[in-house]
């Protein structure tokens, strides 16, 4: 499917029905529908996502979608949850592999790169989740908000560790710093395209911005 595939993490490989084996034809069809919905939602948004477009992209008849999802809203809710859940799992996995001697501030910069690459290059699900977060009614955001809180906790620890190491300016409010950084990273889905520069350049500029904005030497 498209430029970005399904969520890679086991945790975010969706709440498949217990009757569907992951390798079964039904499970594969369900995943195709989710992939297609993520792609369409990332491009057209909550208001513009039609099941007919999802079906066309998934190479299915639209009524087939209802076998797997009771409604359009159920499908959207699953995509929105999966996008954040997978990004959280990806960041946790990346940070787990970072050598112990890497400084707390550099761990933040690694998180910056992981976030940007995931939302801009790896996952339509994450792009859709970030781009549509403010458009969904509250009843569709319960699981997404829970995942956002867990993702934010990873960043809180990163910033807390950097403060303890003296690598963040003491006058900065840690919560505001975190929200400003994440807000800037999330906004990249709205303005970036390869025509505006390579993803590598976006990452390096963002890392420089964050380092110089947070560091006492900045």
Regions from the language model: what does each represent?
Residues 29-37, 54-55, 79-91, 155:
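Generic hydrophobic, amphipathic alpha-helix propensity
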Residues 32, 40-74, 78:
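Helix-turn-helix
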Residues 3-8, 170-190, 201-213:
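Hydrophobic alpha-helical segments that form the core
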């Amino acid at each position: 499917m498209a430029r970005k595939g399904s969520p890679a993490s086991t945790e975010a490989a969706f709440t498949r029905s217990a009757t569907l084996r992951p390798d079964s034809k039904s499970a594969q069809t369900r995943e195709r529908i989710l992939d297609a919905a993520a792609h369409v939602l990332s491009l057209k948004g909550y208001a513009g996502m039609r099941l007919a477009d999802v079906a066309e992209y998934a190479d299915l008849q639209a009524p087939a979608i209802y076998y797997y999802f009771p409604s359009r809203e159920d499908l959207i809710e699953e995509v929105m949850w999966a996008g954040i859940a997978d990004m959280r799992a990806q960041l946790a996995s990346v940070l787990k592999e970072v050598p112990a001697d890497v400084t707390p501030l550099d761990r933040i910069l690694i998180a910056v790169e992981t976030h940007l690459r995931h939302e801009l290059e790896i996952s339509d699900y994450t792009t859709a989740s970030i781009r549509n977060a403010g458009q969904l009614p509250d009843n569709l955001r319960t699981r997404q908000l829970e995942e956002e809180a867990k993702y934010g906790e990873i960043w809180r620890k990163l910033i807390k560790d950097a403060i303890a190491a003296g690598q963040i300016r003491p006058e900065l409010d840690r919560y505001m710093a975190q929200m400003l950084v994440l807000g800037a990273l999330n906004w990249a889905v709205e303005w970036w395209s390869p025509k505006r520069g390579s993803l590598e350049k976006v990452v390096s500029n963002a890392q420089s911005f964050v380092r110089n904005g947070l560091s006492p030497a900045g």
